[in-house]
Amino acid sequence: MQILNFVAAEIEPPQTVLGKVYQHDSVLTEEVMAYLQPQGGGIFLDVTLGGGGHSLALLRGGAARVVGLDRDPAALQAAQARFAAEGIPGSRIQLWHLNFADFDLQQHGFRDEQGQGIPFDGIVADLGVSSPQLDCPERGFSFRGEGPLDMRMDPSAAQETAADWVNHRPVEELIEIFTRYGEERFARRIAHHIEQARPLATTTQLAQVVWQAVPPAARRGRIHPATRVFQALRIAVNRELEALETLLAQAPTWLKPGGRLAVISFHSLEDRLVKWAFRRDPRWQVLTPKPLSPSELERQRNPRARSAKLRVAARSSQM
């Protein structure tokens, strides 16, 4: 199967992608399948393909065809190899190297005999950063290992990196993003320490600056003091909340009447956007008044799933 809108030279060889670097367990898969109900056939859109777990579950569950999107070239190649190993024919899966905020039904979806984009029966979005991205120091998403301050979901994209943000943005702007995207109460202290320590090149350098910036009492918690700063920078670099707002606004136009959108979020900023969009937009009918969380068994098997929340809504027939 072909990856569309894609240059193969942008990414690492398949053996690297399929090894330790790209092993990812999809979260809340059973719950997503229960709401999207692929057993009846139909076509589905996976806007955050990752390692292909949700798409594969849809195809195994009876979906006729799936369109998969991802910004990360490594994720696309890993998923492509996984589908091939599972014997999924290319006619059932269409992959795009694409930010879901840029998806266009006519251009990127399946088409009918008249050449018109076919609306989907369901859409799944598994937001945030994946385990392979976190576990690869070269991607710069985590301070657990030393790597460049990158944090781009698409390393091939011509966009600012986290290093560009911490080294060149005004202090007041850093304070704003640490507060808004990281809900960091020591944002001002941290931003001023970053200004004094510039230039910063690696994840561990930034983590050490944050550690020194916060009061000693804040260093003794279960969560490392740099966690919220790294989250804020990642969200800012990739414009994640803006992309999510676009998805929530556009998804009703990509769905058939009654088609469902399942969104998995991992922090309160994302969940709040999903919750209010589902409640306030008359095009949505909420199917999960309260978000679903992973079972105890899933949390034990995959500790990173513990903060996941699933919300589902159906496209109203009144549009």
Curated annotation (Swiss-Prot):
Q: Which residues bind S-adenosyl-L-methionine?
A: 52-54, 70, 100, 126, 133
InterPro entries in the cross-refs: RsmH (IPR002903), SAM-dep_MeTrfase_MraW_recog (IPR023397), SAM-dependent_MTases_sf (IPR029063)
Which keywords fit this entry according to its UniProt record?
Cytoplasm, Methyltransferase, rRNA processing, S-adenosyl-L-methionine, Transferase
Q: Where is this region: Disordered?
A: 289-319
Family matches, as CDD domains: AdoMet_MTases
Asked whether the keyword Transcription is assigned, the reply is no
Annotated Gene Ontology cellular components are: cytoplasm
Question: Organism's domain of life?
Answer: Bacteria
Role noted for this protein: Specifically methylates the N4 position of cytidine in position 1402 (C1402) of 16S rRNA.
Q: Which HAMAP family match?
A: 16SrRNA_methyltr_H
Q: Which PANTHER family match?
A: 12S RRNA N4-METHYLCYTIDINE METHYLTRANSFERASE, S-ADENOSYL-METHYLTRANSFERASE MRAW
Task: Family membership, please give it.
Answer: Belongs to the methyltransferase superfamily. RsmH family.
Protein name as catalogued: Ribosomal RNA small subunit methyltransferase H
Q: Which organism is it from?
A: Synechococcus sp. (strain JA-2-3B'a(2-13))
Q: Gene name on record?
A: rsmH
